[in-house]
Amino acid sequence: ITRRLSKRADQLSIQAKTLSQQNVIASKLSNLSLQLYSHLLQNGYVKNNEELEFINKYFYNKLPKYEFDSFGFREKLWLYKSHLWFSFLCQDIVNSYKYARKWVDLFKENKKYITLHPVFYLKGINYLLEASFFVQKRSIFKRELASFEEEIEQKIIPLNTNTELLIFEYLYANKLHLHFL
């Protein structure tokens, strides 16, 4: 009995250390994402090479070292969000699309998180549509917008005051974007 408890204590200690490391990575990525978003709000998009160099250095200096294979849902989400904001800041719309796509696919591969974090899911869909619009990919945009409408009709996204407002805003803004594609 004593050996079993000792082994169990060791297992719990290892699990606690792993969880702690995941929390540190998630926190660093979350902070990086928020700092990039804040920079975008305060300064706008990169306008010249000097600003591009600053953002590149800032991003890569703040991006923590990680092993992607050890990531769970949360760490992947914050990684994709960080790369998305970095790409948007640099006006790299192709990479913005790439990371918005990864963000949305992460939710679609882990459907329970759509219910747990519907606002993040909706924001990911909106960024995916926005990036599709900017790269002028009409067929992709139409497909993603139709998929969004289908999810709304099938009530896949939980409804509350916040999600209803976001759905309304994102759906009709993107229907307007479709008109201009």
For each feature predicted by the language model, list its residue ranges:
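Detector for Asparagine
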Residues: 23, 31, 43, 48-49, ...
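Alpha-solenoid helical-repeat scaffolds
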Residues: 6, 49, 53, 70-74, ...
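C-terminal intrinsically disordered extensions
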Residues: 56-86
